Amino acid sequence: MRILYLDPFSGISGDMFLGLLVDLGVDPEKIKSRLEKLNVEFDLVVKKVNKKGVTATKVDVVFPRKEHHEDHIVSDHDHHHHHGRHLSEIVEVLSRLEDPLKEKAIRMFEALAEAESKIHGLSKEKVHFHEVGAMDAVIEIAGAVVGLELLEVEKVFCGTVNTGSGFVMTEHGRYPVPAPATAELLKGIPIYMDQKVRAELVTPTGAVILKILVDEFRTPILRVEKVGYGAGTMDLEIPNVLRGYLGYIEPSERTGDVLIETNVDDMNPQLFGHLMERLFEAGAKDVFFTPIYMKKNRPAVKVSVLCHESKKDEILKLLFKESTSIGARVFYPEKVEATRTLKTVKTEYGEIPVKIASFDSEIVNISPEYEACKKVAQEKGIPLKEVYRAVYKSVSEVRNDV
């Protein structure tokens, strides 16, 4: 599995994350091309900079005839919102992205608005985004989700986040670091406040990248392919860079997941569907039911739930509340999986992504992406199996490329 591990020893911001992606090999022109759908006129200025002896990539989002600003959010209580944008306007812009990227980008902006609305006691629909700062964040957020896809990353991990310390000036006055909205976004994320660095190291955009795009906050065992550095704007006692490792998780690396199982033989069958929905809502990664026979040949259902270890207690509590179970088994599985990469193949119906599985340096499976094939079938008015046939016909091209 190809992963990105973030090492935010000097914090994280939207421009630092974009800089990291470019430093790891993402073509900024491809990001710009993919973001043309937003109908926002902008440019990405990319340059190499030196931060305390570390060469890093700096990416600035620049708009015509407008000064570049650090992204920030203000509420209706602010006296400087004459040219602000509401969340609905931002969502309208981000909705021009393709699925599933737009869903992630919209979730990120909604999280920004929810954090600010909670701090100021407003509904998120009333939160105002400064015009330049808002569009800055739109490009950084959309660029982040597009860049991860271009990097063909399947999972993002992150270490403990350095927020810095001291105070920062906001539209509402002087606040301790991290600023209130940023602190709200950092809930549930492992952080530390470095007292030797008196600066705001995590911006709201950086915090929402961590909140929505990071899958796990731990250090995995990985085989490193590349190390990259995205530069921030400050000159500090430490290099103001976001370090990232691009690599592969070893197939036998423990996932940090738990498997919870319980046998149920006395529950109304109509309740199982609701149980599954609630378990997924609570953060289960997978839920499946297996028909079994218990003692005395009594028919029953084995309920299996896969979740991250941090969700174990919550899942168990829900399982006992929503089912008739009074006990469960908890396993710590070791997952062995093939290394997966995403490639695009050219077919008679256009370019279609495929997932390539390799084990022990040998390709063991090539699988077309179902949703992409389904979309082509619907657009062309042809059977889905015909699209699959075209993909498999072009599969030799992918094998030679891997």
Swiss-Prot record:
InterPro entries: Ni_insertion. It catalyses: Ni(II)-pyridinium-3,5-bisthiocarboxylate mononucleotide = pyridinium-3,5-bisthiocarboxylate mononucleotide + Ni(2+). Pfam families: Ni_insertion. It comes from the Bacteria. GO terms for biological process: protein maturation. Involved in the biosynthesis of a nickel-pincer cofactor ((SCS)Ni(II) pincer complex). Binds Ni(2+), and functions in nickel delivery to pyridinium-3,5-bisthiocarboxylic acid mononucleotide (P2TMN), to form the mature cofactor. Is thus probably required for the activation of nickel-pincer cofactor-dependent enzymes. This is Pyridinium-3,5-bisthiocarboxylic acid mononucleotide nickel insertion protein. The gene is larC.
